[in-house]
Amino acid sequence: MTARPRAVSGLDVTLLGRFVIRSADGREIRIVGRHAQALFTLLALTCRPRTREAIATDLWPESLGAATGPLRQALYQLRTALAAAGLDLDMVLEADSETLGLRPEALRSLDVARFEACTDDPFCAPEAAVAQYGGDLAEGLGHDCFAGERERLADRYEDALAVVARQRLESGDEEGARLAAERLIGRDPLREEAHEVLIAVHGQTGTRSQVVRQYRRLCDVLARELAEAPLPETDATYRVALAQTIARSRERAARLERSTGTNLAVVG
């Protein structure tokens, strides 16, 4: 006896980083093929029916008039995956001969929407926004139509990461500040505020050579990429960091001298 398709109570969709779709009961729905994954991603981000021609042109502009071929294949793969999961296709897809879209009730949660809502909400902590960002949008799909949205979301993430690095530093969490700043620099070496945080961290916990190396890295990348010098506030942080390391070195030397003097007195 053929199983009856289940009504959809909402899909949980992850598009940031690894592509994942889960049913309301937590089961992962596997969609095979990058074209099918790209189609679902575009439909989830659009949230309204669009003409099939417009969808095909967005996803496969290089195919010109033949783009409906890849669309038919991707739609077939998508329908097959949803049906294999036992879902009622009519409750997920809104489709006719001209248009295609996801029904609004088909999505219970979308990580992109949660992340954007958090970055828009002044009461949502930047730490929460950073935690919700699982990776760049549509990683590995390679479709140019996602490039603009991917960059926009990445900018929001990097802005939140910069705030997190600064907040951790100000709260005394030097290690957490270092990790956040290094992650930001790994994504964008031109983020001067992240370099400044690392300079400050090295000033508080590191050595003079670490402070100097970090400052020189910043100077080099700014000169090479922008033909600019560090901002005055970064220079001020650099001077403070140098002074902190020098003070610690002198304190250690003084302790060593006192210890040596005490030992000599005991021997004498």
Regions found by a protein language model. Give the residues of each.
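Intrinsically disordered, charged and Pro/Gly-enriched terminal/linker segments
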Residues: 1-6, 28-30, 34-36, 45, ...
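Extreme N-terminal starter segment of soluble prokaryotic enzymes
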Residues: 11-12
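A structural micro-motif at secondary-structure boundaries
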Residues: 15-37
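Conserved RecA-like P-loop NTPase ATPase core
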Residues: 21, 40, 55, 78, ...
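Short capping segments at the starts of secondary-structure elements
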Residues: 42-55
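Short amphipathic alpha-helical interaction segments
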Residues: 66-77
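C-terminal flanking helix
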Residues: 75-86, 219
